């Protein structure tokens, strides 16, 4: 069920590919940053608990 893109097929498919790669990178960066912030928050909460 692939639509016919004619002479623009390579350009359109390359654009889709680039979009998917950038989207995957953005999602990965978001997940990595979220994990870092979670670890930092947990460490800060431990310091607050230990300080009384």
From Swiss-Prot:
The chain crosses the membrane at residues 12-32. It is found in: Cell inner membrane. One of its GO terms (biological process) is cytochrome complex assembly. Keywords: Cell inner membrane, Cell membrane, Cytochrome c-type biogenesis, Membrane, Transmembrane, Transmembrane helix, Transport. GO terms for cellular component: plasma membrane. It is a single-pass membrane protein. The keyword Plastid does not apply. Belongs to the CcmD/CycX/HelD family. Required for the export of heme to the periplasm for the biogenesis of c-type cytochromes. This is Heme exporter protein D. It comes from Rhodobacter capsulatus (strain ATCC BAA-309 / NBRC 16581 / SB1003).
